[in-house]
């Protein structure tokens, strides 16, 4: 092989010098702007575009790879031009050959002066530094310039310099390739012919450039020569072909931090200086300016879940004396206190007595797990003493849960020592029996009956317990003392605590909490035994209730064991209820109904008892009341009703809050009571599922016209019934949205003949739903048509009621959030899934970040989204078919 046929090359990684690039000339004409552009931007008239001679252009050059710059740009030096742009200048780029990646490209932008201190791009072009075979470019290249844009260094680039979009560019590209082949020795060199050929090539290129609408920038890349031999630069990376291990799975590496969990000395020093006792006298008379006052008002208005920043805590502490006149600010102040510092805690407790008394509903926050100081918790109990029995009953379920955050030793120490007493000779409390806690049946604590009595004492005549006026009561003592004064409170306190005592999950997971509830029940039993005759009657009636429920559970188990179909089980149920010798349920001494103790019952009517069509077959029972009437209930065995009990309690509370604002939305908060983790009572409301209404009557309006016709009312329906329907729809739409009630279909929406619509079956709450893509609220086409359609007056009234209800409930959001915060450790299925997110889920539904006006617009969007939810309609049809095939 001859010397001329050899290919000489050098690796790019071995050439440790900077890349150089020569900027040659710029060919082509710049297109002038239109007169309209000059009128809109008069500065154009003074730019280089309108100079008589060639304007003073300059070129910047920058290397890119993968869309990122590898170095700073460099530019040509100043040069004055007369007839053509010709820099003829070598630029030394701040990048060396070994540092160039395979996909490196150089971006060239031509700039023109545009006013003082500014420039505009004439055009840009980009070219890769390595060819498709990995050879570094050499020699001269004519690059197409894209007008009025900067060179694009991304990959792929939007300003390619080497392109063949037209026939003329194809011709120039073909000639450039032939020139390159001649330079590399792939053609026979004939001097006289070469000179003629190159001259002709230059003429063709000049002609093509002139006829083209684009400008062309000529650049030249360095050629490497050694010993009169030309070398090509081949891209090569040392050790680039070696395989490198790739981790298919990551591994966490734990790096020990010696300062982790250690005290931050700077923060501690700042905290001590900010809370110094020396600043107390000066803080006493401190008043905030307007800006600070607004900031304090914002902090006070925060929801109870909001964590205060260190700056906000310091601000509240600084103006603590000023805030003592604001009852809403007390909880925020107590959050600022570091209770581990004795002096700071002492200051806070001294100020607690001087603070303006907080509202009863706000004091519930102080009973949550976040407040462990016993004085603070007893202050909350002292505020609860101001609540009447009706309000206390609304919070009782949560207050029983709040016992989990009390001092268990204090509750245990409240038990009286074991001793025989003449008053208890007929029935000793379990604590005197010597039975160990592990062998305790919680229902036996209070089911040792006294001699029977004719009727329970009126709540107003119950004698006050001696410690009832004690301002230092803990929560347990307070609840027991109030229950001893009111038979209704005693009824619900007993059943709420009984359920906690019988909770097997708590017994296994947290034995101390289980033991605490047993001690609460013992103390309750002792308090009832210590009272006068009327108080001891309460204990006797609670024991009778427990016996009655136990017999009913025994009966339901016997019915469930019965083989055969539902009809046969119904017959067995009625037969057992009628057998007074075995069950003694149809004729009993007068006792309060556990579900609603104001109702006194004499037994169950056997002939009317029936079982529902469902897997667990709950029983519908009719109780004989004291006045000879009937009270229908549903008794469920094998089902945990605590979640339904919570939701109905919150709905009942919301109904009371709305009525307080003179807004009666005709809600139906039927009563639910869990008497165990496996059984309980539900009030039965005579009603028809909406699905059945649509099947039998065709529409909701037809149903109303059948049972409440009126010639003068809207659509031939009684105006009162239509008003009730519209209001109840609005109330439940807003409430079920806030509580995140899921699994809504027309079988668990019920309708009464008086127009009340209400929801049942709250197995999915807080955003959980077995169906995909549920709408924000259950509001389908059939329900809207029941109001007369989206254009009707009733539908507009429905929307108005939704807005009003939502705004009112937002104002009571703190109370509702406090109640849910006390339930986070309750064994309620949908809360136990994510207890730390429970309160946040409810808070998010209130949208407290919005103003009232914004909240109304937000509710509008929710209603519109729910009405037009197409997927929800499809799911409803699927559910309808599924129910059909089950039947």
Curated annotation (Swiss-Prot):
This protein's cofactor list reads:
Mn(2+)
C2 PI3K-type domain residues are: 35-184
* E.C. number: 2.7.1.137
List-wise, which residues carry Phosphoserine?
165, 244, 261, 282
Q: Any idea where this protein resides?
A: Midbody; Late endosome; Cytoplasmic vesicle, Autophagosome
Q: Where is the composition biased (Polar residues)?
A: 156-170
Its recorded reaction(s) are:
a 1,2-diacyl-sn-glycero-3-phospho-(1D-myo-inositol) + ATP = a 1,2-diacyl-sn-glycero-3-phospho-(1D-myo-inositol-3-phosphate) + ADP + H(+)
Q: What is this protein called?
A: Phosphatidylinositol 3-kinase catalytic subunit type 3
Q: Which SMART domains match?
A: PI3K_C2 (SM00142), PI3Ka (SM00145), PI3Kc (SM00146)
Query: Which intervals of the chain are annotated as region Activation loop?
Result: 759-780
- UniProt-listed InterPro entries: ARM-type_fold (IPR016024), C2_domain_sf (IPR035892), Kinase-like_dom_sf (IPR011009), PI3/4_kinase_cat_dom (IPR000403), PI3/4_kinase_cat_sf (IPR036940), PI3/4_kinase_CS (IPR018936), PI3K-type_C2_dom (IPR002420), PI3K_accessory_dom (IPR001263)
Q: Show the PANTHER family listed in the entry.
A: PHOSPHATIDYLINOSITOL 3-KINASE CATALYTIC SUBUNIT TYPE 3, PHOSPHATIDYLINOSITOL KINASE
This chain's function reads: Catalytic subunit of the PI3K complex that mediates formation of phosphatidylinositol 3-phosphate; different complex forms are believed to play a role in multiple membrane trafficking pathways: PI3KC3-C1 is involved in initiation of autophagosomes and PI3KC3-C2 in maturation of autophagosomes and endocytosis. As part of PI3KC3-C1, promotes endoplasmic reticulum membrane curvature formation prior to vesicle budding. Involved in regulation of degradative endocytic trafficking and required for the abscission step in cytokinesis, probably in the context of PI3KC3-C2.
Per the record, which residues fall in region Disordered?
149-170, 415-466
Q: Which organism does this record belong to?
A: Mus musculus
């Amino acid at each position: 092989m001859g010397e001329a046929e050899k290919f000489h090359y050098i690796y790019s990684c071995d050439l440790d010098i900077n890349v150089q690039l020569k900027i040659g000339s710029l060919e082509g004409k710049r297109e002038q702007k239109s007169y309209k552009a000059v009128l809109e931007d008069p500065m154009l008239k003074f730019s280089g575009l309108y100079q008589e001679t060639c304007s003073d252009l300059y070129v910047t050059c920058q290397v890119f790879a993968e869309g990122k710059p590898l170095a700073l740009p460099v530019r040509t030096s100043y040069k004055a031009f007369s007839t053509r742009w010709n820099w003829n200048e070598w630029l030394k780029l701040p990048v060396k050959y070994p540092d160039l990646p395979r996909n490196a490209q150089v971006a060239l932008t031509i700039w023109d002066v545009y006013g003082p201190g500014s420039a505009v791009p004439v055009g840009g072009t980009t070219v890769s530094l390595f060819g498709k075979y990995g050879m570094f470019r050499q020699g001269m290249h004519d690059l197409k310039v894209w007008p009025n844009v900067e060179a694009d260094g991304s990959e792929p680039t939007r300003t390619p310099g080497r392109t063949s979009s037209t026939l003329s560019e194809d011709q120039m590209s073909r000639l450039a390739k032939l020139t390159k082949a001649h330079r590399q020795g792939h053609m026979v060199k004939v001097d006289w012919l070469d000179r003629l050929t190159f001259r002709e090539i230059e003429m063709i290129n000049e002609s093509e450039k002139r006829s083209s609408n684009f400008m062309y920038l000529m650049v030249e890349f360095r050629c490497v020569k050694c010993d009169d031999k030309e070398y090509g630069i081949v891209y090569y990376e040392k050790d680039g072909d070696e395989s490198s291990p790739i981790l298919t799975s990551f591994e966490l590496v734990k790096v020990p931090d010696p300062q982790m969990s250690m005290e931050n000395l700077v923060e501690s020093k700042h905290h001590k200086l900010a809370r110094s006792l020396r600043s107390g006298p000066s803080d006493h008379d401190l008043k905030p300016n307007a800006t600070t006052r607004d900031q304090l008002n914002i902090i006070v208005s925060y929801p109870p879940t909001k964590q205060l920043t260190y700056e906000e805590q310091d601000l509240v502490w600084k103006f603590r004396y000023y805030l003592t006149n604001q009852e809403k600010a007390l909880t925020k102040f107590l959050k600022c206190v570091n209770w581990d510092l004795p002096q700071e805690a002492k200051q806070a407790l001294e100020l607690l007595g001087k603070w303006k008394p907080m509202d009863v509903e706000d004091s519930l926050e102080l009973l949550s797990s976040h407040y462990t100081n016993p004085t603070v918790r007893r202050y909350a109990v002292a505020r609860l003493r101001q609540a009447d029995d009706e309000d206390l009953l609304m919070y009782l379920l949560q207050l029983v849960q709040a016992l989990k955050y009390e001092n268990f030793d204090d509750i245990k120490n409240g038990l009286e020592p074991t001793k025989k007493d003449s008053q208890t000779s007929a029935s000793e409390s379990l604590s005197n029996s010597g039975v160990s806690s592990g062998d305790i049946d919680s229902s036996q604590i209070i089911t040792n009956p006294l001699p029977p009595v004719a009727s329970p004492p009126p709540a107003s005549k119950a004698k006050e317990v001696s410690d009832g006026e004690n301002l230092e009561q803990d929560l347990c003592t307070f609840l027991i003392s109030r229950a001893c004064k009111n038979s209704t409170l005693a009824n619900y306190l007993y059943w709420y605590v009984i359920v906690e005592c019988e909770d097997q999950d708590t017994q296994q997971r947290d034995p101390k909490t289980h033991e605490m509830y047993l001690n609460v029940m013992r103390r309750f039993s002792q308090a009832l035994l210590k009272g006068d005759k009327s108080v001891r009657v309460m204990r006797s009636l609670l024991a009778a209730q427990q016996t009655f429920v136990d017999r009913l559970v025994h009966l339901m188990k016997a019915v469930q064991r019965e083989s055969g179909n539902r009809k046969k089980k119904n017959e067995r149920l009625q037969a057992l209820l009628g057998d007074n010798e075995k069950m003694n349920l149809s004729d009993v001494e007068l006792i309060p109904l556990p579900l609603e103790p104001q109702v006194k019952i004499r037994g169950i009517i056997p002939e009317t008892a029936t079982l529902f069509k469902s897997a667990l077959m709950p029983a519908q029972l009719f109780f004989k009341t004291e006045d000879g009437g009937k009270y229908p209930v549903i008794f469920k065995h094998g089902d945990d009703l605590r979640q339904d009990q919570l939701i109905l309690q919150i709905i009942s509370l919301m109904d009371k809050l709305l009525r307080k604002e003179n807004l009666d939305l005709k809600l139906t908060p039927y009563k639910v009571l869990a008497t165990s983790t496996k059984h309980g009572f539900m009030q039965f409301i005579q009603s028809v599922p909406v699905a059945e209404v649509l099947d039998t009557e065709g529409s909701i309006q037809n149903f109303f016209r059948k049972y409440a016709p009126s010639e003068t009312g809207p659509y031939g329906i009684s105006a009162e019934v239509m008003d009730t329907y519209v209001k109840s729809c609005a109330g439940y739409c807003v409430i079920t949205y806030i509580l995140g009630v899921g699994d809504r279909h027309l079988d668990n929406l019920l309708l009464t003949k008086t127009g009340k619509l209400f929801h049942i079956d709250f197995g999915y709450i807080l955003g959980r739903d077995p169906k995909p893509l549920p709408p924000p609220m259950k509001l389908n086409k059939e329900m809207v048509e029941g109001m007369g359609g989206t254009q009707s007056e009733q539908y507009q009234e429905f929307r108005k009621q939704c807005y009003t209800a939502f705004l009112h409930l937002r104002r009571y959001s703190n109370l509702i959030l406090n109640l849910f915060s006390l339930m986070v450790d309750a064994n309620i299925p949908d809360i136990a899934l994510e207890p730390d997110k429970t309160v946040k889920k409810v808070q998010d539904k209130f949208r407290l970040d919005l103003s009232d006006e914004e909240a109304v617009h937000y509710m509008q969007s929710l209603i519109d989204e729910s009405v037009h939810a197409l997927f929800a309609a499809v799911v409803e049809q699927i559910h309808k078919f599924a129910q059909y095939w089950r039947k």
